[in-house]
């Protein structure tokens, strides 16, 4: 290639000297220099040659062009519709001049997709994959390739949204119901939710449930719980006003009747299996609740906690087919007795019926959640871990109860063999009964043992008392056992030890702790054990759900943009997937480099000084950010400042998170233009100035406008001693145009699953890292196992997630998105998102009222359609429009939020003009259908809106008595064609029936379509 370049009279550089390479890249890099980069004193001929080379070899793989939907022609046409000459003019008329960024972003040049994957390979190679037997809630597992390929790597599964619209979400609702049934069966409890963020968070939610249940302010924790779980619980308790005490069961005193609940681990963090029946009975006698952190795989052979009276069982489902991922994402489970179900946190899938009487699925008891009850909600949970819960459910379905029991027995047998070999080698075991974890008092030098382990690249857990911990898993084979025995100086092989032990019943199967109750007896767990059948089952469920593979999902405040294949590819690489979160840092240098680079880029994009990646969702980021503010104020001696001002238009998570952080919420009015009411804000600040802690604002506002006085709002709060928390949910309208850290915000969470391309996964995973200004940096969260303190003066707020860096394995997605877009591409994405929204608003403004606009008549990246007048004119509500949109092949916009009776639309930058036009055409057609009702041309009760959605079963039925045609029902516009139509699979849901007849586990098999039973096949 050099000779070819010389033939053109050019000079082509290699490596750092003449080309551009991303940090961490290796090998020659042929990308041209940035035009803005300095030559460092090089000659002008070389610079000219470089520019000539760019013209001769132009880029043909510009990722921004792939990511941003509208091309140049589309953009010109949309600008013409708006009566604007350029996109710069649009931004000038939309974003206040005083906050606009006056310089280009200081970012590396964009990188092509092939190069980004090569660079990520180089970074990931710096992670060392040792065999980690550290345990503590994280285990190696065998991820079935059929689930990996057909679910985790499948855009039809990962690009769905939380199933608020059940008629187009029956597939993942069924899968999540399977997950809940799995959890209930294995734990022996009555009801389970559809996942929480991680085990530590689940334990903290248990603490809050106990407090809500009996209003007692003391919570007892067994110190043999996992240390990260204890830390998360203690941090939550600090701001909830609950006192936590670490006590062994024999030390726990319930006589004062002041204990809300007790938390213990079964088996505990040291591996011990013990009987907690007496503890549970003592707790119940005093009116306290018993909470058990446990292990689903262990419970496949171990007596379940529901059988000895536990009220709440929680833990991680990670070892059910989900990789370690350096800490996540993993789905936590949470199960309760039936009497506690209405206080349970998080989403819950229930069985109900549709308009035809068919049993179907929906999200149940939503009135207890943050988007409705706000600060009085059971939790602030919004995003959870739906995708990982679906993986765990499919793992259980694929293996069935017998397969899971087989895996559990295999793990337990391996641990028994290892324990026998260790005892023969002169080592002492701390506990006699265990499942998969041993705590070992070495009979020789611990340093010597660790040295031999390092030779084999094996990690153990080192306890503070000098003992070692080993936790085995389903991947352990005979060679692994031989290596472990050699490390501890055992002269026998695993085979010899096993032969000497014989096949007599040992361990849990020979004890009173043996599980005798059946589990996973429902036919769904006994029908899909071949790969053929599990693939067909996953595909059947996928086909019931609308996702980004079908059409745009215009949910306001949700930013359902493209999740590109190149961004997603690295998350399944073993170098990212198979790293335990507590390995020494020198084994995770690739991850550490990625964290540093992503933090640097996010700081540049936001104007903040430091970023913490620990929060696993936007709501958890809110809680972490507000807790950081409280820690800062406490350190200043201003702990009395607890008032948090929140506009009434705020996300429901805002007041719920402020309540979790121990703040007192004071609402602020919104004026008729959708802005914070400046007069009311000033009055509230004056009223609470002595106790003002913070204001929570969203920008652009949740009403879809850039408020002109945002800097004045921030200044007002600062002048009265408060801090500014800016909700990052709408960051997709700011990147490259303005930075919250520049116009007065002190802290924000960043929804990486919105602005920065992590897929929503049908309700999680997400990431909510928080960015802070430097005065808050010393108070960012820490971790008890891996310290995150950057200096000795730090005063961390505590721990908010179980893993030090949260859901680490999905961070490469956002890293890759930023690197491939570059500063210019990121700014273009923001501009296009704003252009798309304004174009749609313009097309729809003569048919629907656009509720709020900015000072110069434009919306931000989203807008609100007012459907309230139709209630009076045609008895049509927002829900009718939402359901009718399904017949046109679209998921509904955000419904009845932030204003009841309205629809909020956010198109994102990824949708091209043709798709925007299809959606607008659908909305205009629906408006005409409403007009037909208003003008008496169609029945006001039996019409396409009230009867929507129209399923395939309905349209093809031999019975059709509706006063409109099947064609109007199913194919209302020319672009809705039989060959490409997405069909709702059920009729309209009956929400009231579902909450009045609560069923949250799998219904009888009669309601399933085309059931297949391997058991029936075998018996025949």
From Swiss-Prot:
Reported effect, residue 373 to W: In NKH; decreased glycine catabolic process; decreased abundance
Enzyme Commission number: 1.4.4.2
Stated name of the protein: Glycine dehydrogenase (decarboxylating), mitochondrial
Effect on the protein of changing residue 362 to C: In NKH; decreased glycine catabolic process; decreased abundance
InterPro entries: ArAA_b-elim_lyase/Thr_aldolase (IPR001597), GcvP (IPR003437), GDC-P_C (IPR049316), GDC-P_N (IPR049315), GDC_P (IPR020581), PyrdxlP-dep_Trfase (IPR015424), PyrdxlP-dep_Trfase_major (IPR015421), PyrdxlP-dep_Trfase_small (IPR015422)
Modification sites for N6-acetyllysine: 447, 514, 648, 664
Record keywords: Acetylation, Disease variant, Mitochondrion, Oxidoreductase, Pyridoxal phosphate, Transit peptide
Effect of mutating residue 376 to E: In NKH; decreased glycine catabolic process; decreased abundance
Annotated phenotype, changing residue 905 to G: In NKH; decreased GCS P-protein glycine exchange activity; no effect on abundance
Organelle transit peptide: 1-35
Effect of residue 461 to W: In NKH; decreased glycine catabolic process; changed localization to the mitochondria; also expressed diffusely throughout the cytosol; decreased abundance
Domain of life: Eukaryota
Entries under HAMAP family matching the protein: GcvP
Effect on the protein of changing residue 580 to Y: In NKH; loss of glycine catabolic process; loss of expression
Family, per entry: Belongs to the GcvP family.
């Amino acid at each position: 290639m050099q000779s070819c370049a010389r033939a053109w009279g050019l000079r082509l550089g290699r490596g750092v000297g003449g080309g551009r390479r991303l940090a961490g890249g290796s090998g020659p890099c042929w990308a041209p220099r940035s035009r803005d980069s300095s030559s460092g004193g090089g000659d002008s001929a070389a610079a000219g040659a470089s520019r000539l080379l760019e013209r001769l070899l132009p880029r043909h793989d510009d990722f921004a062009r792939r990511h941003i939907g509208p091309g140049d022609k589309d953009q010109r046409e949309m600008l013409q519709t708006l009566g604007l000459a350029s996109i710069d003019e649009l931004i000038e008329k939309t974003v206040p001049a005083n906050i606009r960024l006056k310089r280009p972003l200081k970012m590396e040049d964009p990188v092509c997709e092939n190069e980004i994957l090569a660079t990520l390979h180089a970074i990931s190679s710096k992670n060392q994959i040792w065999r980690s037997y550290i345990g503590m809630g994280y285990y190696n597992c065998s991820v079935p390739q059929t689930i990996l390929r057909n679910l985790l790597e499948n855009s039809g599964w990962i690009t769905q949204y939380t199933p608020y619209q059940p008629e187009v979400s029956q597939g993942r609702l069924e899968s999540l119901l399977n997950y809940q049934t799995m959890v209930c069966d294995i734990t022996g409890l009555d009801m389970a939710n559809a996942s929480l963020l991680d085990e530590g968070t689940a334990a903290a939610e248990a603490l809050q449930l106990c407090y809500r249940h009996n209003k007692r302010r003391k919570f007892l924790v067994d110190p043999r719980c996992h240390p990260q779980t204890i830390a998360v619980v203690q941090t939550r308790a600090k701001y909830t006003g609950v006192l936590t005490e670490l006590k062994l069961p024999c030390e726990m005193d319930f006589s004062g009747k002041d204990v809300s609940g007790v938390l213990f681990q079964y088996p505990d963090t040291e591996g011990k299996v013990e009987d907690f029946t007496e503890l549970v009975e003592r707790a119940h006698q005093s009116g306290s609740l018993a909470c058990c952190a446990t292990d689903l795989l262990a419970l496949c052979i171990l007596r379940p906690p529901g059988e000895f009276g536990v009220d709440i069982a929680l833990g991680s489902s990670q070892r059910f087919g989900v990789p370690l991922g350096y800490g996540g994402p993993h789905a936590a489970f949470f199960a309760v007795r039936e009497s506690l179900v209405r206080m349970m946190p998080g989403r819950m899938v229930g069985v109900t019926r549709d308009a035809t009487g068919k049993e179907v699925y929906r999200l149940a008891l939503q009135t207890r959640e943050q988007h409705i009850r706000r600060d009085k909600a059971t939790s602030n949970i919004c995003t959870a871990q739906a995708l990982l819960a679906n993986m765990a459910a499919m793992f259980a379905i694929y293996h069935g109860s017998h397969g899971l029991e087989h895996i559990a027995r295999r793990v337990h047998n391996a641990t028994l063999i290892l324990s026998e070999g260790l005892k023969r080698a002169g080592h002492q075991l701390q506990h006699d009964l265990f499942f998969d974890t041993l705590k070992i008092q070495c009979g020789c030098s611990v340093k010597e043992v660790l040295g031999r382990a390092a030779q084999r690249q094996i990690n153990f857990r080192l306890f503070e008392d000098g003992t070692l911990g080993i936790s085995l898993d389903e991947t352990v084979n005979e060679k692994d056992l031989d290596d472990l025995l050699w490390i501890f100086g055992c002269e026998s092989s695993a085979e010899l030890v096993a032969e000497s032990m014989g096949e007599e019943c040992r361990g849990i199967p020979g004890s009173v702790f043996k599980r005798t109750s059946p589990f996973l007896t429902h036919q769904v767990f006994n029908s899909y054990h071949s790969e053929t059948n599990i693939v067909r089952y996953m595909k059947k469920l996928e086909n019931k759900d609308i996702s980004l593979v079908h059409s745009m999902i215009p949910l306001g405040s949700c930013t359902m943009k493209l999740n590109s294949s190149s961004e997603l590819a690295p998350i399944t690489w073993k170098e990212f997937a198979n790293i335990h979160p507590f390995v020494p840092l020198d084994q995770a240098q690739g991850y550490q480099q990625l964290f540093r680079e992503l933090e640097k880029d996010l700081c540049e994009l936001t104007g903040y000084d430091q970023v913490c990646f620990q929060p696993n969702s936007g709501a958890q980021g809110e809680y972490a950010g507000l807790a950081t503010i409280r820690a800062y104020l406490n350190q200043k001696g201003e702990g009395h400042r607890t008032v948090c001002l929140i506009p009434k238009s705020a996300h429901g998570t805002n007041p719920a998170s402020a309540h979790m952080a121990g703040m007192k919420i004071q609402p602020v009015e919104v004026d008729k233009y959708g802005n914070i009411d400046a007069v009311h804000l000033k009055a509230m600040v004056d009223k609470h100035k002595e106790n003002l802690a913070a204001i929570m604002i969203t920008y652009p506002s949740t009403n879809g406008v850039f408020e002109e006085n945002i800097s004045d709002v921030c200044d007002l709060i600062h002048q009265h001693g408060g801090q500014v928390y800016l909700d990052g949910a709408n960051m997709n309208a700011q990147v490259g145009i303005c930075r919250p850290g520049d116009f007065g915000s002190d802290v924000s969470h960043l929804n990486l699953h919105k602005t920065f391309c992590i897929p929503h996964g049908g309700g999680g995973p997400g990431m909510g890292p928080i960015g802070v200004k430097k005065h808050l940096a010393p108070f960012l969260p820490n971790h008890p196992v891996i310290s995150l303190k950057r200096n000795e003066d730090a005063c961390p707020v505590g721990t908010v997630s179980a893993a030090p860096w949260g859901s680490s394995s999905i961070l490469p997605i956002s890293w890759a998105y930023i690197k491939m877009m570059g500063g210019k591409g990121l700014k273009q994405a923001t501009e296009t998102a704003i252009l798309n929204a304004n174009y749609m608003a313009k097309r729809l403004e003569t048919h629907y009222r656009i509720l709020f606009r900015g000072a110069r008549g434009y919306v931000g990246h989203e807008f609100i359609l007012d459907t309230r007048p139709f209630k009076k004119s045609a008895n049509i509500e927002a829900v009718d429009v939402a359901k009718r949109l399904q017949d046109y092949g679209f998921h509904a916009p955000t419904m009845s939020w932030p204003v009841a009776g309205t629809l909020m639309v956010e198109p994102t930058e990824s949708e091209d003009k043709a798709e925007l036009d299809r959606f607008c055409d659908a909305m205009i057609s629906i408006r005409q259908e409403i007009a037909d009702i208003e003008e008496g041309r169609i029945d006001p009760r039996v019409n396409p809106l009230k009867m929507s959605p129209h399923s395939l079963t309905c349209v093809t039925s031999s019975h059709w008595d509706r006063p409109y045609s099947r064609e109007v029902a199913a194919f209302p516009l020319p672009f809705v064609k039989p060959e490409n139509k997405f069909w709702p699979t059920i009729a309209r849901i009956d929400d009231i029936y579902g909450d009045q007849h609560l069923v949250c586990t799998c219904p009888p098999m009669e309601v399933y379509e085309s059931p297949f039973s391997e058991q029936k096949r075998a018996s025949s």
